[in-house]
């Protein structure tokens, strides 16, 4: 068993969680973490084979999980997600983690790409929250939105991605104010996390990113998942509208240069 799970115990026993973008990376690690802490987890993605593989791993370890193929930017698909979750029970936890990115400078980015990136990276969080809000209100649920350190610091070739991640922080605060005290809403801001997004990145570029952190290494999806689990657990009952940075000190190193 993961030592952090052993230390904190089963904080989500009897609860149902929905995790989007759950077929890989931070989403998969979060689904696995919540399942190890005894949540029943609905994994949402469009990468069916990978998503089902994560579910199979969870159930093999004795957890409860199922996979739903859905476009999180389509409101009708959220009705199916909620129906699937209700096979376990009302939704207590929503992790809005799905993302997409097209790398191009603003002057080369098509309006269609801009709209799709905002739809998945921003609008999907609104649609998901709206869909599960009745459950969250009734059961004093928790929401975690996956933003990014690039909500605050620009990154070449990512205008729509950065814009959406910045807007997520405003959405986080707005939802926390509007729906407290029944619902808590927080955001995590990962920095350089070693996921499939780094596939194809040159060793030199990787080393440059590592050098920009205070801990001189990449973070892992499991470390972000631990932060998300904390924000959604009862220990964080007095935390809402917050922005938890998980970046190995990347932000402070960048600010000191």
Question: Model-found features: residue ranges?
Answer:
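Active-site loop immediately N-terminal to the catalytic Tyr-X3-Lys motif
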Residues: 107, 153-159, 216, 234
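Alpha-helical segment proximal to the catalytic Tyr-Lys
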Residues: 134, 176-181, 237
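Substrate-binding pocket helix/loop in short-chain dehydrogenase/reductase
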Residues: 105-106, 110-118, 198, 209
């Amino acid at each position: 068993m993961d030592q952090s799970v052993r230390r904190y115990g089963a904080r989500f026993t009897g609860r149902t969680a929905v995790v989007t973008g759950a077929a890989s990376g931070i989403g998969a690690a979060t689904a696995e973490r919540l399942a190890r802490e005894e949540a029943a987890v609905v994994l949402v993605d469009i990468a069916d084979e990978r998503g089902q593989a994560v579910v199979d791993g969870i159930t093999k370890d004795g957890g409860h999980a199922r996979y739903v193929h859905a476009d999180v930017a389509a409101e009708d698909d959220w009705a199916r997600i909620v129906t699937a979750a209700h096979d376990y029970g009302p939704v207590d936890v929503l992790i809005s983690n799905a993302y997409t990115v097209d790398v191009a400078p603003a002057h080369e980015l098509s309006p269609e790409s801009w709209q799709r990136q905002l739809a998945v990276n921003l609008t999907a969080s609104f649609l998901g929250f709206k869909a599960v809000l009745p459950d969250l209100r009734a059961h004093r649920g928790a929401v975690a939105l996956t933003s990014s350190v690039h909500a605050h610091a620009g990154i070449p070739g990512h205008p729509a991605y950065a814009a959406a991640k910045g807007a997520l922080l405003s959405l986080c605060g707005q939802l926390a104010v509007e729906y407290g005290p029944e619902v808590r809403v927080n955001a995590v801001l990962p920095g350089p996390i070693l996921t499939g997004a780094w596939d194809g990145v040159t060793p030199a570029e990787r080393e440059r990113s590592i050098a920009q952190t205070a801990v001189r290494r990449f973070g892992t999806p499991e470390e972000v998942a631990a932060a998300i689990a904390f924000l959604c657990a009862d220990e964080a009952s007095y935390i809402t509208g917050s922005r938890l940075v998980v970046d190995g000190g990347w932000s402070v190193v960048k600010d000191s240069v």
